[in-house]
A protein has these predicted regions:
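Membrane-embedded alpha-helical bundles of multi-pass transporters/translocases
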Residues: 2-471
């Protein structure tokens, strides 16, 4: 416990935060996988959506097992970092293999399906222990938010890399005659995305050496609890059930929003691919700027209220563009700004909210089950992405989207606009209901919980006064 009480050093915090660059792969996937498969690789829109959805669905289920394995690891090197090291190399390699145009005839779909599935399996194998490790750097309510703020800033640097930089690099290679249209994608992804993922993933692994529970701390965990019992016990905790439901619903809307943004810019607003990609730059800058206000909102009003405020921001932006009617670059910029503000605050506070549940679990069960919490949270996120990407593909197919034509019908343009504005708002509104009624951890009752937990561990008298509602 002594290790947990310590606040992570600045170097550890920065090194850990840099590991979020691994999410470059996730952002590249979200922004360009469907676009690459449909317009470059020649895969049908519905098939592309299915490949993405199936890969995310299988990987989401896999993250449950990774969470359980990580929580129960008895490695002398730690519970998180050995798994991170094992997964980072294949994650980077598979990311490169996805964005290669192949022509295996009837086997082309199988190639992309297999590579996409393997990528996300290894990606989550890295990500679940990595995210879990963040909870073990400190138990301080506000310090956790600051850690997640840095992670989110780095995440949005990865948004710039996977959403904007890669497109400029690809365009530069194509204009220089390097690889043609398809080959330029391969080189751009390998150099600007896969390589940084590998380097910064290893930096996070190295910077957190000695910061995870090993030895006696592992021996303190309850014995004989199988994976089913472990996750059922976590889901019985109402605050976590609330944040798990939120993650599922919110990230469906978020995935649809991000995945449709390129289509919205290119086809509805009539922009070039490079110009449309600047929306990701806008959202990245907004996210970085919002890191400090997000911390202030969380500290002033609590993480739950900050999360609800964040979703209201996109509600206003999305409704404005939809009601006014999209007509130019500025409308996409409004969407990008709203997306950046909402997603920045949401990512910062939601992970920190999950971390805070660890102490509640420990008080009730004698084990924080951090990786189980992160695994379940990631499952909700992954299921949401699977559903979201599939919905994008099927909506485009249903509306009659023609990938070979730059001029789309009015019904297709209306479908893209609705998918970019109203659909995300509906999912965010539904997710807010779960948070409002189930997640009741506040700065005040969390402080009382931590105080009682410390007394309980030291064998002293303790009281549940101040956090009874959490039990």
């Amino acid at each position: 416990m002594e290790n947990q009480k310590k606040k992570g050093t600045l170097g550890t915090t920065i090194g850990y935060g840099l590991g979020s660059m691994v999410r470059t792969g996730e952002n590249l996937w979200g922004f360009y996988l469907s676009y690459f498969l449909v317009t470059v690789a020649g895969v049908g829109a519905a098939a592309a959506g299915t490949i993405s959805g199936v890969a995310l669905l299988l990987a989401s289920v896999w993250c449950i097992f990774i969470g359980y394995i990580s929580d129960n690891s008895k490695s002398k090197h730690g519970k998180r970092r050995p798994i991170m090291l094992f997964a980072i190399f294949p994650t980077a390699i598979l990311m490169s293999l996805i964005f290669i145009k192949v022509d295996f005839g009837g086997g082309t779909l199988a190639y992309y399906a297999i590579v996409c599935i393997l990528f996300y399996l290894f990606y989550y194998t890295y990500l679940v222990p990595y995210d879990s490790l963040g909870a073990e750097l400190t138990v301080d309510y506000n310090a956790r938010t600051r850690i997640r703020s840095l992670c989110t800033v780095i995440l949005y640097v990865s948004v710039f890399v996977g959403g904007t930089l890669v497109m400029y690099v690809q365009t530069g290679f194509a204009n220089a005659g390097i690889g043609g249209e398809s080959g330029s994608w391969s080189w751009a992804v390998m150099l600007s995305c896969a390589l940084p993922m590998l380097v910064f993933g290893l930096i996070a692994w190295a910077a957190t050496k000695g910061k995870e529970p090993v030895g006696e701390e592992i021996a303190e965990q309850p014995k004989g609890e199988n994976i089913v019992k472990s996750y059922l016990s976590v889901l019985k905790v109402k605050p976590f059930l609330g944040i798990a439901i939120w993650s599922l619903l919110y990230f469906i809307g978020n995935t649809i929003l991000a995945g449709t943004l390129v289509y919205f810019g290119v086809y509805v607003l009539g922009l070039s691919e490079a110009t449309a990609s600047t929306y990701f730059t806008i959202s990245m800058v907004v996210t970085i700027v919002m890191a400090i206000p997000a911390n202030w909102l969380s500290g002033k009003f609590g993480k739950k209220t900050a999360l609800l405020i964040a979703m209201c921001v996109y509600l206003v932006c999305g409704l404005f563009v939809c009601i006014k009617g999209p007509s130019g670059y500025a409308d996409g910029a409004i969407i990008a700004i709203g997306y950046g503000i909402t997603n920045s605050i949401a990512l910062i506070v939601s992970y920190s909210m999950v971390y805070d549940i660890g102490e509640l679990n420990e008080f009730k069960f004698g084990d924080s089950k951090v990786a189980a919490c992160i695994g379940t949270y990631t499952l909700g996120m992954g299921l949401a992405q699977a559903i979201g990407y599939s919905l994008i593909g099927y909506i485009l197919a249903w509306a009659g989207f023609d990938a070979m034509s730059m001029e789309q019908s009015e019904s297709v343009l209306n479908a893209i606009t609705t998918t970019e504005t109203i659909v995300p708002i509906l999912f965010m509104a539904a997710s807010a209901i779960a948070v409002i009624f189930l997640y009741r951890i506040t700065p005040k009752n969390y402080a009382a919980l931590v105080e009682a937990l410390e007394a309980k561990k030291e064998g002293k008298e303790y009281s549940t006064e101040g956090f009874e509602e959490l039990l």
